[in-house]
Amino acid sequence: MSVDLNHTIVHARDNRESAEFFVDLLGLEITSEWGPFIAVALNNGVTLDFATIPADRITPQHYAFLVSEEEFDAAYAKIGQRGIEHYADPHRKQPGAINYNDGGRGVYFMDPAGHAMELITVPYGGWTA
């Protein structure tokens, strides 16, 4: 059986602000807007469908994105240019740093809605042979 993720709804205080944050930071594009949703497409066809909801109803989630070394460099440069607080670890004990887990690089930061974001260049456990 083949099962693929098609889309996920990402709650935001402002769907446009959150969608544009991802578009700008990761070089993605808005592919559609309908109803309460602004969809941002990832390379594998999955969309992040941003929906505005009241801030007190947002439950922070964690989203991890596997990116190339070049994409990491570009995104990390933007994180630095914008003064976005970032950490090498999910518990925020190593501020202003990145990690080198599994032979790659990774960084954690928050999006405008308070979701914990992670960029990694190597999947957890490393690449399979």
PLM features: residue spans?
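Structured loop/turn residues at beta-strand edges in well-structured enzyme cores
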Residues: M1-V3, I58, P112
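Short, solvent-exposed beta-strand edge segments and adjacent coil->beta transition regions
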Residues: L5-H7, G45, P60-H62, G104
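Short, flexible helix/strand-to-coil boundary loops that buttress conserved ligand/catalytic motifs
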Residues: F22, Y76, T121
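Short secondary-structure junctions
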Residues: G27-E33, I84-Y87
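N-terminal beta-strand motif that seeds the catalytic metal site of vicinal oxygen chelate
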Residues: M1-R16, Y63, P123-A129
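Amphipathic alpha-helical segments
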Residues: R16-E29
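Vicinal oxygen chelate
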Residues: F65-P112, A116, Y124-W127
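Conserved short beta-strand elements that form part of the metal-binding/catalytic scaffold
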Residues: E29-Q61, V67-E69, M110, M117-T121
